[in-house]
Amino acid sequence: MARDYQVRKYIADNAAKYDDSRLTKVLVKAFDLICSNEEPNGCMSSSVALHVILRSLGYEPKLCYGLCVTPLGNEIYHAWLELNGEALDIAIYGNSHFSPFWNDAQLLPVVFENYNNTAIRYRDHVFDEDWKNCMISQAVNMGSIANYIAKAPHAQHPSGNGIWKLIFSILDETYTRSKQESLQRFVSKEAFQCQEQ
């Protein structure tokens, strides 16, 4: 898929408030990977990967998840990040552009936006009776980010752990065991948690 330079610019412009080229680079790279893979269901894996990366850059993101409401009123279980009280959701672009099940408006990534200004109504820790059946619930039931990285279905891929591969792809770095161990300290024993909106 061709790169969407307007969306890349939008991400870079919104990330500029942090005046951190490393942050801008990883957000644009995460977007590029979602587009090149035409990833429709990557909200948890993308959010976890960016959570690890942002912590390694010195930020304190929160990993959020819950039942969100789309512009046309459809409900979806979704995962995203929050940084300094603002939503960060690169994966919503993939959900809205590549999923055959998406029956709503195509959305831009949400990059450091106030919750009141987003097209999606994010509802952290809001669940319905079908929560236990959704893929995000299965990830949360693994207990911690470290367990999710180690035990998620894509973690057992023959060519290596999928989440670590995603992290290194977003960082645009070659995988090394020592670098993984360095990054691992940002996720070990960190439980899935979020504050209610």
Predicted features along the sequence, with ranges:
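A structural boundary/capping signal
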Residues: M1-Q197
